[in-house]
Structures are given as C-alpha cells and as structure tokens.
UniProtKB/Swiss-Prot annotation:
Organism, scientific name: Chlorobium chlorochromatii (strain CaD3)
Pfam family, one: Ribosomal_S5_C
Subunit architecture: Part of the 30S ribosomal subunit. Contacts proteins S4 and S8.
Entry keyword set: Ribonucleoprotein, Ribosomal protein, RNA-binding, rRNA-binding
GO molecular function terms attached to this record: rRNA binding; structural constituent of ribosome
Endpoints of the signal sequence: none
NCBIfam families, A to Z: rpsE_bact
Name the record gives this protein: Small ribosomal subunit protein uS5
Length: 172
C-alpha cells in the first residue's frame, strides 16, 4: 500500500463544510475543585473528494470546535472517487481501531456508522459498505478512515507508479 502523493491542497480555494463528530469533556482536579476543558473532533470536506479532520482543545465548547475546524482545514486530503464509490476494497488499522471499506454499486447508499459516516459524507462518497472493527473510540476511528482514504489509489495513480498507460494497467 502506497500513500497517494501529497499535492498541496489550498483549503481557501475549496468550499469546505464541517461536521462535528465528537465532543469530550475533561476534568482536572485542582485545590478549589474541578477545572473542566473540552476537546472536539471535527471533519471538514467539500463533498467533492476533499476531506480532512481536526482536533481542537479549549476551555469552552465553541472554542474547541473552532480550533478543530481550523486544524481540519490544514489536514485536507484528496480522495479518488469513481462513480460515487471508492476504486477498491481496503482494510486499515489505526491504534486498536480497524476500518474496512468496500466499493458498492450505485444505489446502495452510504452504509457506515458514526465517525466513519461523517468522514465519508464530507468526502462525497455516496455508495460504500463499511465496517468498524475493534475500538470504537471516535478519534482512532476517524484517523483510521482518513488513513484508509489516503491509501486508496485509482487506475491513473497505478499507471503513474508503474510508468504505464491506462490500457496497459487494465491488461495486466
């Protein structure tokens, strides 16, 4: 598995939307009681093949979400989409979270749960079958889904790596 080449994507040129995946409240015990903080994991995307995620931490929920959105815009990747789905099946593990993604025929819909669904919706994938195995921690599940989308390559990428034309790729 080879990561797709990281071409510079300028998030300012994209019409990015954001989706909040998870908010977590943390507590620090101090002399006077408990001091609460928040962290938010946010997925950003243009629903046309660009997606990213960000983690924001702050003392207020809105500040954490805003920081997460800014972080997500810095981590945008390009996803190859073929006829509303992914070109091939992939299984990816991040930490203890394992995500399996399979291409589906048009009309199947987006069959995914929770955090993976948010990532795929923001990427603009309409027909896909997914299964989240192992840990259900939203942080690791989102990272596994993004990692999987990074490793997906279409026929053009395969042809470039092998220095072959598109017809040669399909013959072999």
């Amino acid at each position: 598995m080879a990561k797709t080449s990281a071409k510079s994507i300028r998030p300012g040129e994209l019409n990015l939307k954001e989706k909040l995946v998870h908010i977590n409240r943390t507590a620090k015990v101090v002399k006077g009681g408990k001091r609460f903080g928040f962290n938010a994991i946010v997925v950003v995307g243009d629903k046309e093949g660009h997606v990213g995620y960000g983690l924001g931490k702050a003392n207020e929920v809105q500040d954490a979400i805003a920081k997460g959105i800014e972080d997500g815009k810095k981590n945008v990747i390009k996803v190859p989409i073929v006829k509303g789905t992914i070109p091939h099946q992939i299984v990816v593990k991040y930490g203890s979270a394992k995500v399996m993604m399979k291409p589906a025929t048009p009309g199947t819909g987006l069959i995914a749960g929770g955090a993976v669904r948010a990532v795929l919706e923001m990427a603009g994938i309409h027909d896909i079958l997914t299964k989240s195995l192992g840990s259900s921690n939203p942080h690791n599940v989102v990272k596994a889904a993004i990692k999987g989308l990074q490793y997906i390559s279409d026929a053009y990428d395969v042809g470039e790596r092998r220095s072959k034309s598109l017809s040669d790729v399909f013959e072999s």
